[in-house]
């Protein structure tokens, strides 16, 4: 259940943060904050379904998924195509997340 939880968490976190961004940076209605708060709460709840021994490890591994999901959001929602540096950074983060998730534990 870890990957679906990570993906749901990413959607919740990105949508919630974008709602705040929309209000503060783009001058959107403060009503955007209501779904933003709900989205951020859903993000936090989703991470409780990650199969990990410690919350910190789950959060650290999630970081790679969050970064990749943020770039997909940027491309599909905001219409800004990621460049090679975005892709390189995301690949490095996913590699780090894979080490955290799949590394041998004694």
From Swiss-Prot:
Transmembrane parts of this sequence: 4-24, 30-50, 58-78, 84-104
Record carries keyword Cell membrane: yes
Main location: membrane
PANTHER family linked: UPF0060 MEMBRANE PROTEIN YNFA (PTHR36116:SF1)
Gene Ontology cellular-component terms listed: plasma membrane
Keyword vocabulary terms for this entry: Cell inner membrane, Cell membrane, Membrane, Transmembrane, Transmembrane helix
Bilayer topology: Multi-pass membrane protein
Protein name, per record: UPF0060 membrane protein Xaut_1380
A Pfam family hit: UPF0060
Membership in a protein family: Belongs to the UPF0060 family.
Compartments (UniProt record): Cell inner membrane
HAMAP family (UniProt xref): UPF0060
